[in-house]
């Protein structure tokens, strides 16, 4: 028996060119389909590990798309955060929305209802000062969440009413959750106090 890959493609082992084309043609989820009918430009991303629809948007149109999905029933910002794809790679800002009013209405009426949820992602260059518009004006719950993302990753939120650090001291240098962060020498910090 050979250790090499099978030479004949099967449904479970497609040919390499079939695999590449399958990845390139993701099926848009229901929110993405709705955004298409409304004329909003966005990217279809793979669903997450539990099947939540994920959509990529440009930072300039983030507030417009957030307002649109809010009017489409996604009335609750469950969480906002960021992550670093790795040294030299992009920073990512994500927003997870759920249709809370629909869920409450269904539960009150005793009807089974599957929770509608969607996650928006904005991909940012780590060069310079990454920034995007704040959605605080649409969702007040974004206040501390955007501040934490700024504090840990250095992503600025334009138009945020309280643009200051949340967890770290105001004079802290750097962004502690970035993969390229160089931690200050612990003993030098200890001597400062």
UniProtKB/Swiss-Prot annotation:
One Pfam family, short name: Complex1_30kDa
Record-level Gene Ontology MF annotations: NADH dehydrogenase (ubiquinone) activity; quinone binding
Entry annotated with the keyword Flavoprotein: no
InterPro entries xref list: NADH_DH_suC, NADH_quin_OxRdtase_su_C/D-like, NADH_UbQ_OxRdtase_30kDa_su, NADH_UbQ_OxRdtase_CS
Protein's UniProt keywords contain NADP: yes
Superkingdom of source: Bacteria
Main subcellular localisation: membrane
Region (Disordered) location: 1-21
Position of the signal peptide: none
One annotated Gene Ontology cellular component of this protein: plasma membrane-derived thylakoid membrane
EC number(s) reported in the record: 7.1.1.-
Subcellular location: Cellular thylakoid membrane
Homology family: Belongs to the complex I 30 kDa subunit family.
Function: NDH-1 shuttles electrons from an unknown electron donor, via FMN and iron-sulfur (Fe-S) centers, to quinones in the respiratory and/or the photosynthetic chain. The immediate electron acceptor for the enzyme in this species is believed to be plastoquinone. Couples the redox reaction to proton translocation, and thus conserves the redox energy in a proton gradient. Cyanobacterial NDH-1 also plays a role in inorganic carbon-concentration.
Protein name: NAD(P)H-quinone oxidoreductase subunit J
